[in-house]
Structure formats: structure tokens, C-alpha cells
Amino acid sequence: IKINRLEDIIGKDESIVRIMPNLPADRLKGVTAVKENKRVEPKQSKNLALLLEAFGETVKFVEERKFDAVTAISGSGPAYIFLIAELMTEVGINLGLSYDEAFKLVKHTIDGAGSLIVNSSLKPQKLRENVTSPGGTTHEALAVMMNKDNGLPKIFSAAIKAAAQRSKELSKV
């Protein structure tokens, strides 16, 4: 629900904060988007930040219109990672691994890669390049995944834009 709609309901003189947490907050590793209206006082803002930071990181926004992108990237983002884990596990099984073997490899690969991206000063592209040997196995896989016509860049763009559009539609309800 947008802040201006809440102001219409409870009054423009009230302190109102819109937040968008994501599921990893359940493990204290989430990220919460925050947008405050003009009535939120500095002490209220500070106290809210302390509370929300207990669940992970926070990102404060000046423009509420960015919440549709936030929802598509961060709110829905865990599902995208879960789908990747699901697909990688399934392919592992198809290549002869047991479910337990494949899933253990996948979940620890995702956990380790997540730790690398969070704790590194390198951008994701550089981390990817560091793992990719020219002509190697990763190079071959990425050539398929990054195909401009039907690869992941096109699929991810379409999917995340669809989520952002749906967020816009839902915020009008």
C-alpha cells in the first residue's frame, strides 16, 4: 500500500513508513527497503533502522516509485534463487547424482557464492569472470546461458519486468 493512500486513510499528519522485507529476514540475512513520509522524525527513523537492521540490511529510498523494482528484485528474488537451486539439482540427478548428492552440492555452492558476493569488493561480473577459464566447462555453460536470443539475460529481464509490472498493478488495489 502506497504511503499517500495510507495518508488518505489515517491522515497526512501521521508518521508513516513503507517497508518491503524479503524472506531471508527469517534467517537475519534479509534486506528491507524503507520509505518514510515527511512526518517521520529523526529519532523515529533511527529507532526503526535499529529494529530493521536486526533482520539484515536496509536500503532507504527517497522515491517510493522504486518499490515496484524493489519488489521484483528483492521481494521475489529468493524465489529466483530457489528455482535455480531446483533446476541445478534436477540436472545433477539427470547426470547421475542422487538427490542428496546433487542438492548438497547445489545448496553449498549457492551459499558459498552468496558469501563471496557479499564479502567481496568485486562486482558480480568480475567474480564470474574469475571462475571462467577460456574454453573450459564454465565457459561452455555460460555461452549457453548468456545467449542473447534465448538465454538468461533475456529471460531474467522479462521475468523481473513482469514482476515489477504486477507490483504496480497490485499497488493500485
Where in the sequence are the language-model features?
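ADP-ribose/adenylate-binding Rossmann-like module
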Residues: 1-2
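Internal alpha-helical scaffold of NAD(P)-dependent oxidoreductase catalytic cores
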Residues: 5, 9-15, 31-69, 80-119, ...
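Short pre-catalytic strand/loop immediately N-terminal to key active-site residues, enriched for Gly-Thr
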Residues: 16-17, 66-72, 124-129
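Short beta-strand segments
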Residues: 18-20, 35, 156
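Glycine/serine-rich anion-binding loops at beta->alpha junctions
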Residues: 20-25, 71-81
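Acidic/polar active-site rim loop that often engages polyanionic ligands
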Residues: 26-35, 143
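NAD(P)-dependent Rossmann-like dehydrogenase/reductase catalytic/cofactor-binding core
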Residues: 107-173
